[in-house]
Swiss-Prot record:
GO BP term, example: defense response to bacterium
Record localization: Secreted
Keyword Secreted applies: yes
Organism in which the protein naturally occurs: Lithobates berlandieri (Rio Grande leopard frog)
Disulfide bonding pattern of the chain: 18-24
Keywords carried by this UniProt record: Amphibian defense peptide, Antibiotic, Antimicrobial, Disulfide bond, Secreted
Name this protein carries in UniProt: Brevinin-1Bf
Function: Antibacterial activity against Gram-positive bacterium S.aureus and Gram-negative bacterium E.coli.
Tissue: Expressed by the skin glands.
GO cellular component, one term: extracellular region
Family from the record: Belongs to the frog skin active peptide (FSAP) family. Brevinin subfamily.
Transmembrane segments: none
Length: 24
C-alpha cells in the first residue's frame, strides 16, 4: 500500500510543483 502511495506522490508532486512554480 505504501509503495503505491509513494509512486502516486512521485508522479503527482512534480506536476503540481511545475504548475505552481511555472518551472517545467
Amino acid at each position: 500500500f505504501l509503495p503505491f502511495i509513494a509512486g502516486m506522490a512521485a508522479n503527482f508532486l512534480p506536476k503540481i510543483f511545475c504548475a505552481i512554480s511555472k518551472k517545467c
